[in-house]
Curated annotation (Swiss-Prot):
One Gene Ontology CC term in the entry: cytosol
Pfam hit, one: PGI
Annotated organism of origin: Mycobacterium marinum (strain ATCC BAA-535 / M)
Gene: pgi
Name of the featured protein: Glucose-6-phosphate isomerase
EC numbers for this chain: 5.3.1.9
GO biological process: gluconeogenesis; glucose 6-phosphate metabolic process; glycolytic process
Amino acid sequence: MTSEQSIPDITATPAWEALRKHHDQIGETHLRQIFADDPNRGHDLTVTVGDLYIDYSKHRITRDTISLLVDLARTANLEAHRDQMFAGAHINTSEDRAVLHTALRLPRDAELIVDGRNVVEDVHAVLDAMGDFTDRLRSGEWTGATGKRISTVVNIGIGGSDLGPVMVYQALRHYADAGISARFVSNVDPADLIATLADLDPATTLFIVASKTFSTLETLTNATAARRWLTDALGDAAVSQHFVAVSTNRRLVDDFGINTDNMFGFWDWVGGRYSVDSAIGLSVMAAIGREAFADFLSGFHIVDEHFRTAPLESNAPALLGLIGLWYSNFLGAQSRAVLPYSNDLARFAAYLQQLTMESNGKSTRADGTAVTTDTGEIYWGEPGTNGQHAFYQLLHQGTRLVPADFIGFSQPIDDLPTVEGTGSMHDLLMSNFFAQTQVLAFGKTAEEIAAEGTPAAVVPHKVMPGNRPSTSILANRLTPSVLGQLIALYEHQVFTEGVVWGIDSFDQWGVELGKTQAKALLPVITSDGSPQRQSDSSTDALVRRYRTQRGRTG
């Protein structure tokens, strides 16, 4: 498919109309009734993928809903689009690129020919180079300019070059075992870099500058400031031993002072938000080692193979993506809460925000025509139990429908006994997980509350309406492989929704104009003379006020 080819409007198909009529039929049927009518759904509406046990029974769907959603996916040719992606077809139509993040986790003996090259060989050549480098770093063979071993790596990137590594490093902190810690700088706000470097020793710090083009404004601004910090302490010659690059622009990397032997590349068929398992993950590999990083990749591949081969009726990413679409397009939900009951996954929701919102936040279909329905889910969330004391009130008793994903683990990485000595703190955490999904689904009626002797005036305030849907994802333990499985599970949900909506989930033109305008405004707010008048009165007034408060001519 190219962008010039017309895409059928999915909302004008019989499959869409069948779902609309089905919604009218089941209406606001409560999950209490749905479970009463189908008591085995808690066992039947589950799927196991790798180490992930996924329970989607607490959704406002029936078995007929699932059948109709699968019909919709087949009407949109989801399986054909999926096969094209895995084969390396240029499904990113607006940029005429293949979409091959799945190739980043193919085993070494696999073969995938794209544009005349076996990309698996290229992928593993980079992985081998990353492994050799991080082995030297972790063993102490690689030292800084003074001969001291490196103890801290600072990743400088933004967007996909930051959100993924930050999230994964925190999630897998227990696998960092070589005396190397990682820190991350992304924001061009100088407070980010200053706070990160405040207690570091230049002699034991290594910077990883992650920018495909090596021209990203925020990243290069931070990298230049970090280089100044280093050279002020150790001299210009130290740069080659304290900076490496993740980039494809050899000339600019060399101009910066980084030895191009220490440049780790990737490809234009890897989008930033899908790149944490590429060389962008170098900081993660430095911390956890090449073996654990290989386990991380193997987890992705497990779910990739499931998505590639499983029938849609039992295909976890496809089903969850279609259920998300059901809420977005037929029940009016605008967001999804991601609620990991693991503090190590504190950054998972932020990571998924870029994955889904940059991918599917589109109002134009791949053929250039306007979409005819809402697209894109707004992801947000915090770890349990923190969220319970912040925003769960709205989930339980508010007027907005917010489907939620609960993610938990049977075996904790850390645990402590409770004061009472019964069970452990992890057991307490997970009892909250199970309780919240149960109360969201089934609630508590006015009659039940009144029967407890609650004053009549208070009863309405304590009613828990229920009928609030959720997915429960349970794994044994948070390991590198399990984390890879979780990420791939959401990647393919995003793909599923994008195909049905007919959009290009792999471009991001919406971020470009703001960057261009920022470059144009920088000399306006910094020039010595009176600034050029802006095209609108609001921006003009803001610029002039800022200049005045900075001591420049208004």
